[in-house]
Amino acid sequence: MAGRDITEGRANQAIAVDVGIVSTSAYWQNTSDSYDVALGGQPFFYAISDARPYIRQTAPYNKDKFDNSPEPGEQSLTGWWLRSQSSFHSGSGIKFYDPSAGETVSHRFTDSKNVNVWTKGQATLLKDVATGHVTTYPVESNGRSFQQLRSIKWGSNDGVLLHDGYDVDKIDTTGVETHFIDYNAGADDKVYAICDDGTTAYWVTNDTGPSGKLEVNKKVLTADSTTSATPMFTINGVTVTNATMEYVKDRIVMAANNKIYEFPTSQATAPTALYTHSDDDIIFTSITASGPAIYIAGYSGIQSSIFKFTLNTAGVMPTLTSAITAAEMPVGEKIHKIYYYLGYMMIGTNKGIRAAVVSDQDGSINYGPLIVETTQPCYDFAARDRFVWCATSVAGEPGVIRIDLGNEIETLRFAYANDIYYTGVSGVETTSCAFLGETDRLAFCTEAINQKSVTNKERTTTTATITSAAHGFVAGDVIYVIGVDAALDGNWTITSVTTNTITFTTTTSGTIASTAVTNAFVGKPGYSYLEAASTLASTGYITTGYIRYGTLEPKNFKRLLARGDFSYGSLILETVDKDGVEYDHITYEAGVTAVEVTTSSPSTAQEYVAYKFVFNRDATTTSQGPVFKGYQAKATIATPRQRTMQFPVYCFDIETDRYNVVSGYEGKAFARLQLLEDVEENGDVVAWQDLTTGENRQVVIEEISFTRMTPPDKRFDGFGGIIEITIRTV
């Protein structure tokens, strides 16, 4: 006799649960039974009463917290997420501003121009910059710069000595130039290197006589180009193609071609090379000295090293058959400048700037990572107080970067930021920097570019035309002409061009028609630039790091407040979104109270934003501008709020729906409870259906509480009761 089929149920009641394991993502569809709610595909009847209400509320989204931030008020107990910054003295170089990351982020920002950030607790405009003397020599094909600025003082005049290829000029604090060496590009050779001991300048060139031999000259700094130089010595059989020289430790050290010489300032005969490098093609670039040693940097191809020469007990550099290699750069990184200051050696390369610690015992050096990667080589350094200025350009425009050796962010990585620069010029490299004598005013210079040979010259009255194949200039360009003709050499504005000719108008008149001499050139000039004595830059800015509050969730950035003194000039507050789009909010200036502003743009929630503060100097008192002391931003989390719902359901073997339809079987209650607890233990997301309203949500089960009660029918085993279920939407 066949037994009863399980689907027949008991007491003619159908099975109310699925056979097998129920999927947590399953949905329930009412058929003959009108269930009220389903969770993970399991249906239940509500057991709602005054004693057991259905509760629905917003899930907590702010955790309990206390204020332990280094910036007061950084934690919010009022619903706002706060971010504030009261100083910028640790420099630029971060992308995200998360102060919890420590000193590598605290008091730093992303970018700035024309802003002095080095006073703790405030930021102000830097000084303005004006153009000075033109430069007419480009960077050499081997990568060497033939511009060099040196701080000098002659008589009562503070200024700089500008070496520019064939010429050397003195420039004072007012920008007035005095020709010091005036070699003719068509008749003389260039100045390959120059140094001074504070009163006299020394330089190396080639004697243009038949032998073309190396020649070292000197001249007191109070002289000018009308004063003849004093030849110190010549070296027969040596023609200079590359050189660097420096006055260190009461002597001149000179590297010419692949040989290194040492001689006193009174030298009158050719010295003997104390070291000859095995590579004839090596390019020596820079010389400096620490307490126990003298260093010379150079590169050959894509390999670059620093060579060390230690002094013996008599204070004499020993003659070496091989130099001591103190440091080697990574392949492809070439050293252009080394500069010893405050116990560190600054290293300028084609990749950027490094610092090395120097042993005061044996002069050994240990260099660190790149402090900053630059868009051009770092050709030069200048120093005052705890700061070092670096000739690197500022975002492709003529200018310098400043490094604070008193603020070490990481091992041998120091705080840095853009410093003074000249806006509106691009495509040139900043090649040198120096202070104007004893002042705190900086000068820097740029290379000339697009230098082309001139093969012919002619002039009718004041209209001059020179021939230069495929020159690439256009009408309106300012050019320099050197070595062509005394009447045509100088700086001119082009009036017209053809593919191979350039026409301009001269200040004198006369007829000229002849082939140009050898070493005649035309090009686009560079300039020297002088920092102003008191006038501030007209505008500047600071852009903060992106603020994301340490989470990737979207936020509503809604409030911004800046603090400072805005009696002079103005400060504009802007938001910068992730795509770099800027949104103006308010301008603080005299007569406008610095109030907290609503930042309604961008209008949508953002994962992160930055803030940009634009400084404008005072229109009347140009030596004054805004003093910015910090900001505070407020945001709220934009993540959709979650809801918790708590409701009771029946869990008995036999149950009746609202239409008195009975369903169930013996053991059903315990089986359903176990299935529900299994889903809870997995922590998975399940489908919740309110079958009375049609609402469907994805939820997680927060809590299940089962209360066992007396079953309505004593025929059953007695297991059953009320389940209190708490869920949270996701």
Segments (PLM) and residue ranges:
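Small/polar beta-strand repeat architecture
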Residues: 450-523
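Extracellular/virion structural assembly segments
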Residues: 398, 635-730
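Non-cytosolic beta-sandwich-type ligand-binding/adhesion modules
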Residues: 2-50, 218-221, 263, 309-311, ...
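Loop/turn-rich, solvent-exposed surfaces of beta-rich toroidal or solenoidal domains
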Residues: 375-408, 430-432, 559
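N-terminal beta-propeller domains
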Residues: 2-225, 229, 249-251, 255-277, ...
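Repeated scaffold domains used in trafficking and secretory/extracellular systems
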Residues: 106-108, 138-155, 185-198, 234-250, ...
